[in-house]
Amino acid sequence: MRGRPCSCAFTGHRRGKLPWGEDESDLRCIALKAKLRAAVESAIHEGMEHFICGMAEGCDLYFAETVLALKSTYPHITLEAAIPCPSQADGWGEAQKSRYRDILARCDYETMVQQSYTPGCMQRRNRYMVDHASLLIAVNDGARGGTRSTIEYAFKRGVNVLDIPLD
Protein backbone atom coordinates (compact mmCIF):
# COMPACT_ATOMS: atom_id res chain seq x y z
CA MET A 1 0.00 0.00 0.00
CA ARG A 2 1.22 3.50 -0.83
CA GLY A 3 -0.06 5.24 2.32
CA ARG A 4 -2.52 8.03 2.91
CA PRO A 5 -0.97 10.97 0.95
CA CYS A 6 -1.35 9.25 -2.43
CA SER A 7 -4.48 7.20 -1.68
CA CYS A 8 -8.04 7.62 -2.90
CA ALA A 9 -11.05 5.80 -1.48
CA PHE A 10 -14.52 5.45 -2.94
CA THR A 11 -18.08 5.40 -1.64
CA GLY A 12 -21.32 5.08 -3.55
CA HIS A 13 -24.74 3.50 -3.64
CA ARG A 14 -25.59 -0.16 -4.01
CA ARG A 15 -27.56 -1.43 -7.00
CA GLY A 16 -30.86 -1.31 -5.14
CA LYS A 17 -30.57 2.46 -4.66
CA LEU A 18 -29.59 3.22 -8.25
CA PRO A 19 -32.41 4.49 -10.50
CA TRP A 20 -31.49 1.95 -13.20
CA GLY A 21 -31.17 -1.00 -10.80
CA GLU A 22 -29.32 -3.81 -12.55
CA ASP A 23 -29.61 -2.38 -16.09
CA GLU A 24 -26.07 -1.21 -16.80
CA SER A 25 -27.03 -0.48 -20.41
CA ASP A 26 -29.20 2.40 -19.14
CA LEU A 27 -27.82 5.71 -20.42
CA ARG A 28 -27.65 7.10 -16.87
CA CYS A 29 -25.42 4.22 -15.80
CA ILE A 30 -23.18 4.67 -18.84
CA ALA A 31 -22.92 8.39 -18.06
CA LEU A 32 -22.05 7.67 -14.42
CA LYS A 33 -19.30 5.25 -15.45
CA ALA A 34 -17.85 7.95 -17.74
CA LYS A 35 -17.90 10.42 -14.83
CA LEU A 36 -16.18 7.85 -12.62
CA ARG A 37 -13.46 7.32 -15.21
CA ALA A 38 -12.91 11.08 -15.51
CA ALA A 39 -12.76 11.42 -11.70
CA VAL A 40 -10.24 8.58 -11.33
CA GLU A 41 -8.07 9.95 -14.15
CA SER A 42 -8.19 13.39 -12.55
CA ALA A 43 -7.14 11.85 -9.22
CA ILE A 44 -4.22 10.09 -10.94
CA HIS A 45 -3.10 13.36 -12.51
CA GLU A 46 -3.25 14.95 -9.03
CA GLY A 47 -0.87 12.28 -7.69
CA MET A 48 -3.16 9.53 -6.45
CA GLU A 49 -1.55 6.12 -6.96
CA HIS A 50 -3.43 3.82 -4.59
CA PHE A 51 -7.20 3.30 -4.81
CA ILE A 52 -9.33 1.66 -2.12
CA CYS A 53 -12.69 0.07 -2.88
CA GLY A 54 -15.25 -1.38 -0.45
CA MET A 55 -16.36 -4.01 -3.00
CA ALA A 56 -20.12 -3.60 -2.47
CA GLU A 57 -22.56 -4.27 -5.32
CA GLY A 58 -23.27 -1.29 -7.53
CA CYS A 59 -21.08 1.80 -7.60
CA ASP A 60 -18.20 0.17 -5.70
CA LEU A 61 -17.76 -2.47 -8.37
CA TYR A 62 -18.04 0.17 -11.13
CA PHE A 63 -15.22 2.06 -9.40
CA ALA A 64 -13.03 -1.04 -9.07
CA GLU A 65 -13.55 -1.95 -12.73
CA THR A 66 -12.67 1.62 -13.73
CA VAL A 67 -9.39 1.53 -11.80
CA LEU A 68 -8.53 -1.90 -13.22
CA ALA A 69 -9.24 -0.69 -16.78
CA LEU A 70 -6.99 2.35 -16.25
CA LYS A 71 -4.07 0.21 -15.05
CA SER A 72 -3.14 -0.47 -18.68
CA THR A 73 -2.60 3.27 -19.20
CA TYR A 74 -1.27 3.98 -15.69
CA PRO A 75 0.59 0.80 -14.64
CA HIS A 76 1.87 2.40 -11.42
CA ILE A 77 -1.60 2.60 -9.82
CA THR A 78 -2.80 -0.03 -7.37
CA LEU A 79 -6.22 -1.23 -6.23
CA GLU A 80 -7.00 -2.41 -2.72
CA ALA A 81 -10.16 -4.33 -1.85
CA ALA A 82 -11.34 -3.31 1.63
CA ILE A 83 -13.68 -6.14 2.57
CA PRO A 84 -15.88 -5.74 5.65
CA CYS A 85 -16.07 -9.49 6.39
CA PRO A 86 -15.57 -12.78 4.52
CA SER A 87 -19.32 -13.26 3.93
CA GLN A 88 -19.83 -9.91 2.14
CA ALA A 89 -20.95 -11.45 -1.17
CA ASP A 90 -22.71 -14.54 0.22
CA GLY A 91 -26.26 -13.29 -0.46
CA TRP A 92 -25.57 -12.03 -3.98
CA GLY A 93 -26.69 -13.66 -7.22
CA GLU A 94 -24.21 -15.86 -9.09
CA ALA A 95 -23.42 -13.24 -11.76
CA GLN A 96 -22.52 -10.63 -9.14
CA LYS A 97 -20.51 -13.14 -7.10
CA SER A 98 -18.53 -14.03 -10.22
CA ARG A 99 -17.92 -10.35 -10.96
CA TYR A 100 -16.82 -9.80 -7.36
CA ARG A 101 -14.39 -12.75 -7.46
CA ASP A 102 -12.95 -11.59 -10.80
CA ILE A 103 -12.31 -8.09 -9.45
CA LEU A 104 -10.89 -9.45 -6.20
CA ALA A 105 -8.46 -11.68 -8.10
CA ARG A 106 -7.15 -8.63 -9.97
CA CYS A 107 -6.69 -6.39 -6.90
CA ASP A 108 -3.16 -5.64 -5.78
CA TYR A 109 -4.09 -5.74 -2.09
CA GLU A 110 -6.88 -7.19 0.00
CA THR A 111 -7.74 -6.01 3.50
CA MET A 112 -10.25 -8.01 5.55
CA VAL A 113 -11.56 -5.49 8.09
CA GLN A 114 -12.92 -8.15 10.45
CA GLN A 115 -13.24 -11.93 10.45
CA SER A 116 -17.03 -12.25 10.84
CA TYR A 117 -20.16 -10.26 10.11
CA THR A 118 -21.47 -7.86 12.75
CA PRO A 119 -24.02 -5.06 12.31
CA GLY A 120 -21.23 -2.44 12.31
CA CYS A 121 -18.77 -4.11 9.94
CA MET A 122 -19.77 -2.09 6.86
CA GLN A 123 -19.26 1.16 8.77
CA ARG A 124 -15.88 -0.10 10.04
CA ARG A 125 -14.90 -0.85 6.44
CA ASN A 126 -15.94 2.66 5.37
CA ARG A 127 -13.95 4.24 8.19
CA TYR A 128 -10.92 2.13 7.33
CA MET A 129 -11.05 3.44 3.76
CA VAL A 130 -11.37 7.09 4.81
CA ASP A 131 -8.63 6.71 7.43
CA HIS A 132 -6.25 5.45 4.73
CA ALA A 133 -7.05 8.06 2.06
CA SER A 134 -6.47 11.72 1.29
CA LEU A 135 -9.29 11.83 -1.28
CA LEU A 136 -12.76 10.28 -1.26
CA ILE A 137 -14.66 10.00 -4.54
CA ALA A 138 -18.38 9.74 -3.75
CA VAL A 139 -21.41 8.93 -5.90
CA ASN A 140 -24.17 10.41 -3.82
CA ASP A 141 -27.86 11.30 -4.02
CA GLY A 142 -27.88 13.01 -0.62
CA ALA A 143 -30.10 10.40 1.04
CA ARG A 144 -29.32 9.15 4.54
CA GLY A 145 -27.33 5.94 4.64
CA GLY A 146 -23.84 4.51 4.45
CA THR A 147 -22.66 6.72 1.59
CA ARG A 148 -23.70 9.92 3.32
CA SER A 149 -22.23 8.76 6.65
CA THR A 150 -18.93 8.00 4.93
CA ILE A 151 -18.86 11.46 3.34
CA GLU A 152 -19.60 13.10 6.71
CA TYR A 153 -16.83 11.05 8.34
CA ALA A 154 -14.40 12.11 5.60
CA PHE A 155 -15.21 15.79 6.25
CA LYS A 156 -14.60 15.27 9.99
CA ARG A 157 -11.25 13.63 9.24
CA GLY A 158 -10.16 16.39 6.85
CA VAL A 159 -10.23 14.14 3.79
CA ASN A 160 -11.05 15.91 0.52
CA VAL A 161 -14.30 14.76 -1.09
CA LEU A 162 -15.03 14.74 -4.81
CA ASP A 163 -18.80 14.43 -5.08
CA ILE A 164 -20.35 12.93 -8.21
CA PRO A 165 -24.09 13.65 -7.94
CA LEU A 166 -26.37 10.77 -8.84
CA ASP A 167 -28.62 12.10 -11.61
Language model segments and positions:
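Acidic/glycine-enriched connector segments
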Residues: 1-167
